[in-house]
Design a protein with these regions (language model features):
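Extended, histidine- and acidic-residue-enriched regions that form the cofactor-binding/catalytic faces
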Residues: 1-106, 112-231
């Protein structure tokens, strides 16, 4: 059962008897065929869809649409936060929700660049306030099934690639400019680090996205489909 925090009258919130969910995305380029809010749009749709199917009361906090995205600064439209600012801000957001009576919170991350800051938020809420918080990147939940869904080889499901484009074609097709999608080879990596979203990387690196391609995309969006997104 989905209940949206910002669409509920304060006296009807009943936060004490709900699971709180916070979706955290970004505002950054997703090449020239997906909107700047792609990560946020996908996170919100996925949270709503899951909450509507849940038997428990799910209280959806106002979605956070600005994250850590300096690696996209070479392209137009990015709005980004420093990690320390993001940790401080989201800790306050979450602690406010707990003070309103929320007993537990799930943070759904829909942008890879947010992970370090969000881990900091979870650590701080747990160590300083004793709060129960779980953090998940939504794509990790289907990692064991993705090989039976994807059409591309490793390197095809990077930033604005087959995976994200398929989800956007499913959830918000009116925002996808399919005429601009061109045919590209899979992105390349090595044994230690690969830009595919489902790669099992052994190291972390900071890589500006203009080093991957001229439009900042990574992967093979031309293999995307709304049918794949629905799966």
């Amino acid at each position: 059962m989905l209940i949206q925090w910002d669409r509920t009258i304060a006296w009807d919130l009943d936060a004490e008897h709900a699971l709180g969910v916070l979706s955290v995305g970004s505002t950054e380029q997703h090449s020239n065929y997906l909107p700047l809010g792609t990560d946020s749009i996908l996170g919100q749709h996925l949270v709503r869809e899951a909450a509507e199917k849940a038997k428990a009361r799910v209280l959806m906090l106002p979605s956070q649409c600005i994250g850590f995205s300096p690696h996209h600064r070479a392209f137009p439209g990015v709005i980004t936060l420093r990690n320390d600012v993001m940790i401080e801000y989201l800790t306050e957001v979450c602690e406010s929700a707990f003070r309103a009576g929320l007993p537990r919170l799930l943070i759904v991350n829909s942008h890879g660049g947010n992970q370090t800051a969000l881990q900091g938020v979870v650590n701080r809420l747990g160590s300083e306030f004793g709060r129960q918080v779980v953090l998940v990147r939504y794509w990790d939940l289907i990692a064991d099934k993705i090989d039976g869904i994807r059409r591309s080889q490793p390197g095809g499901m990077g930033h604005a690639g087959e995976f994200e484009t398929s989800l956007m074609l499913h959830f918000a097709p009116e925002l996808v400019d399919t005429e601009r999608i061109d045919v590209r080879p899979p992105a390349k990596g090595d044994a230690w680090h690969h830009p595919d979203m489902f790669a099992k990387n052994r190291v972390y690196r900071y890589i500006p996205f203009d080093t991957y391609s001229d439009l900042g995309n990574v992967g093979q969006a031309h293999l995307a489909s709304k049918e794949e997104g629905a799966r």
